[in-house]
Amino acid sequence: MAALLLGCQDLTLTDQSYQRVHVATFSVPIRSLMPGRETYPGSMTLRVNGTVDRPVVLSIYQLSGQTRYPVLTDSLPAGTHVNRSLRQDFYSRDEVELQVSGSPATIGSLEIDWYRQ
Amino acid sequence: MNRFILLCTALLLAGSLRAQSQIGRNSVRLGVDLTSLDAPDAVGPRYVGRLARHFRQDRLLITAEAGYMRLAMANQPFNGIDPGVNRRTRLTADVTVLADLLPNPNHALRLGGGLSTWYRQDDIYMGATRVGLDNVAIDRRSRREVNTGWHLAAEYEWVFVPNWGIDARFRVANLSAAGISSMLGVGISHRF
């Protein structure tokens, strides 16, 4: 039993990095990076809370060398969003980038949680 | 008169029998350990329950222990944005063998060691960066893991009335990826 326990590897059930982006000004497109990871994910998820008075576009890109591949794009309509969730299958270990674009005149703020798992 | 002598004798015998009653060979202990966690450094109370079997006139103990710990620690705001608290949970299970160094029925100084299996669930703030003018990206890490390892233990117990004792103890656990945790605690135990 002792040998069995001591010989055990740590058992990882989940290990995910995630990012919470607070956006208060939309004067220029906002870009936020999430570094690559060692293990392969299975999906990409975005969760949005907040209020905007104009539509805002959310995009996620996979950065592979000099190339940006779109992974997920969604347009948030004007209004209040509570736990609006977007999910996409995603299997790459590459670095990824979140881009938030809106009209410079947009008023409001968004809190965006995004992660791959 | 004979009856009175008989009654006194019976009472004396009863007292003598009570005085020589066996101390239980099992014990249950409840306690709290001030427990340190791996980086980012954190210390908090871990509530512990333990069952023990006593051997060789109380000089050797084999114990099984379970514990629970939950911490929520605030972080400094970054550019006025709260990055959220660090939430850390531990469910612990330990099996320990302890040997008593003092040949005294009311005092015990025990040293020992054993195996540990701890479950950890962490949601931790890793850092933040400014994005553009007034925007902030907060990096966090969420992890659930089962870690195994070993521990060393030292404890002092005072049996203040038959079958009841209080103790203080120090422990160090090495839990591989979860690092080294040290624990300083007190508890009360009952033998049965």
Can you name each region flagged by the protein language model?
Chain A
Residues 33-59:
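Beta-rich globular "head" domains
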Residues 53-58, 104-116:
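Edge beta-strands of jelly-roll/beta-sandwich modules across compartments, strongly enriched
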Residues 39-48, 88-105:
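Noncatalytic modules at the cell exterior or secretory-pathway interfaces
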Residues 16-38:
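Post-signal peptide N-terminal segment of mature Sec-exported envelope proteins
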